[in-house]
Structures are given as C-alpha cells and as structure tokens.
C-alpha cells in the first residue's frame, strides 16, 4: 500500500471514500494499525489520560509527545502521522514554531492544535514555513475547564454558526485537515460540505470524511469515563487486528458511527 499523505486524504474526500484514524503511542500498536490499513495515526495528548492516568490532557508536555512520536514513527511505513501540540505549548506564534519544530523533527508529518480564530496567525505561519496543520474545533479537551466538562458544543444557533465560521477561517489560513469533536451531526455535515479540506469527526456523526477514535476505547481497555461516541470493537471480534479491521470496515460502509454514537 502506498504512503498516505495530505494529498491522499484530499483525493479520498473528492472520491467520497471514508478514511480512518486512530491514536497510537508506541511502535508495536502503531505497526499493527498501520499494517491493517488505518490511514492516519495521531500521537494525541490523550496519552495524559490513557497512559499517564491524569484526569485531563493538561499535564502533557512537548517532551511527552515528542517521545511517543518517535516511538510511533519507528513502527509505521504507510499511515500519515500527526502529533498534538500540548496545552500552552502554542500560546504565541513564536512558541508554536518552536513546538512544531520539535514534533516534526521527532517524526510527525503534521501537527494538530486546538482552538478557533485566535490560532489563525499561527496556522498561517506554520503553513508558510512548510509545516502541515490539522486544526481541532468543537469540544477541545485542552479547554475542558472553560467548557465546564466534556460537553457537546454547537447545539444552539449562535455557537453552531461560530464553529462553522471557525472552520472556514482555519481552512483559509492554511489548515489542510480539520478535526471536529462532540458537535451535532447536522453541524458536522454542514462543515464537511462547506470545506474543501478533509474533515475528521469524533462524536460528530457519520457524514464527515473520516472518523477517529482513541485506541483504548476501540480495544475496550479505557478506565473511568467512556465516551458515548466510542465503540469497543475488541468485544465483538476478540482479537486486536480483527477489531481494527472491523472499525475500518464499519467506517467504510457507513455503519459507524451509528445513532447511539451521535449527538443531535
């Protein structure tokens, strides 16, 4: 299988082909996901919760993400590798450049950052300097205390319009990929149709171009809070690689996410 690039994902969107993404944090799991055909792997700051045992993602450092990015890079040959910029590691344009440099040098193909219009200058500067950007809007976990918890965003008309405007502005600034999290399916569909870049959903209905889940949720090994939008594929398959294939197949045929994983 040929290597996945941002151009590959654009082609998928244009052809209407759904693609898949999973988080990964080490070489062994990354190699398994890569060989089964997962298109995008994310070294997410979710590692703060699922690996380090924190209540949220805020304690994760640039060094943490860089370490796990190097680990994942060694295990893959096909998937596009994205690395999260951790909390407060991109508060200014200059800081964003420094953090992105460290993660790209660790092996990332793209960096992901959370937020809306305040990020536009950073997205523009990264793009101008050859760093591919994935933006993340909707429920942004690094802002969990501002939101008052992990809550669905964009349910009222004003906030829905704000999120749509953010998506358009981030694309115009140069973002090549967008993650939208925990928003109503109708809003996710509107964003996906309004943008020319690929849109990945998590808790955002089935009409996005791609779907991403945390690997621990897919394998049923998460402790504590289990998001409504997740699905334990290991329970129905009994084997890790089969679980990954089931996730890929259900995204491809549109059966995941189902109504039980979707917000209105």
Curated annotation (Swiss-Prot):
Q: Name one GO biological process term.
A: pantothenate biosynthetic process
InterPro entries, per database record? Pantoate_hydroxy_MeTrfase, Pyrv/PenolPyrv_kinase-like_dom, Pyrv_kinase-like_dom_sf
> Is the keyword Chloroplast in the record?
no
Recorded hits in Pfam families, A to Z, give: Pantoate_transf
Lineage top rank: taxon: Bacteria
Instruction: Write down how the cofactor binds this protein.
Output: Binds 1 Mg(2+) ion per subunit.
Enzyme class at the top of the EC tree? transferase
- The principal localisation class reads cytoplasm
Q: What keywords are annotated for this sequence in UniProt?
A: Cytoplasm, Magnesium, Metal-binding, Pantothenate biosynthesis, Transferase
Q: What is this protein called?
A: 3-methyl-2-oxobutanoate hydroxymethyltransferase
The GO molecular function terms of this record are: 3-methyl-2-oxobutanoate hydroxymethyltransferase activity; magnesium ion binding
Q: How does it assemble?
A: Homodecamer; pentamer of dimers.
Query: Gene encoding this chain?
Result: panB
